[in-house]
From Swiss-Prot:
Keywords: DNA-directed RNA polymerase, Nucleus, Phosphoprotein, Transcription. DNA-dependent RNA polymerases catalyze the transcription of DNA into RNA using the four ribonucleoside triphosphates as substrates. Common component of RNA polymerases I, II and III which synthesize ribosomal RNA precursors, mRNA precursors and many functional non-coding RNAs, and small RNAs, such as 5S rRNA and tRNAs, respectively. Pol II is the central component of the basal RNA polymerase II transcription machinery. Pols are composed of mobile elements that move relative to each other. It comes from Schizosaccharomyces pombe (strain 972 / ATCC 24843). NCBIfam families: PRK01099.1-2, PRK01099.1-3. The lineage of its organism: Eukaryota, Fungi, Dikarya, Ascomycota, Taphrinomycotina. Pfam families: RNA_pol_Rpb6. Component of the RNA polymerase I (Pol I), RNA polymerase II (Pol II) and RNA polymerase III (Pol III) complexes consisting of at least 14, 12 and 17 subunits, respectively. This is DNA-directed RNA polymerases I, II, and III subunit RPABC2. InterPro entries: DNA-dir_RNA_polK_14-18kDa_CS, Pol_omega/Rpo6/RPB6, RPB6, RPB6/omega-like_sf, Rpo6/Rpb6. One of its GO terms (cellular component) is RNA polymerase II, holoenzyme.
Length: 142
């Protein structure tokens, strides 16, 4: 047994080692900002509810019209994970479920079922380098 066995989170000088992560803004259904983790190299995206997207106070910047979108209609694995996690959290906090449950009790499984049927009422906001953004509904993404 060593003297430092229980001090696994400390560096050589005894200081606490902290992990650095990039922050990504997430807006919940009340329009309040939440913090999340983004992955290096991933374009900046935000998951928001449809009613927040229609309000002018949600974010500054200019929206791109649907017919002028430049990003692909494919959902990235990071967007998928973010959408499923957000929706599972909503379901666990007693949000209405939009699919037949058929005995399902796990919020993540219910969220996956909603995603498969394209019934998740969320938008993906993709920010572009010029400061504008594109809103994609989950039903539009492949």
């Amino acid at each position: 047994m060593s003297d430092y066995e229980e001090d696994e989170a400390f560096g050589m000088d005894g200081a606490v080692m902290e992990e650095e992560v990039d922050e990504l803004e997430m807006i919940d259904e009340n329009g309040q900002s939440q913090q999340g983790v983004s992955h290096p190299g991933e374009p900046s995206t935000t998951v928001i509810t449809e009613d927040v997207a229609s309000s002018k106070t949600a974010q500054s910047g200019k929206a791109v019209a649907k017919e002028d979108r430049t990003t692909t209609p494919y959902m990235t694995k990071y967007e998928r994970a973010r959408i499923l996690g957000t929706r599972a959290l909503q379901i666990s906090m007693n949000a209405p479920v939009l699919v037949d449950l058929e005995g399902e009790t796990d919020p993540l499984q219910i969220a996956m079922k909603e995603l498969a049927q394209k019934k998740i009422p969320l938008l993906v906001r993709r920010y572009l380098p010029d400061g504008s953004y594109e809103d994609w509904s989950v039903a539009e993404l492949i």
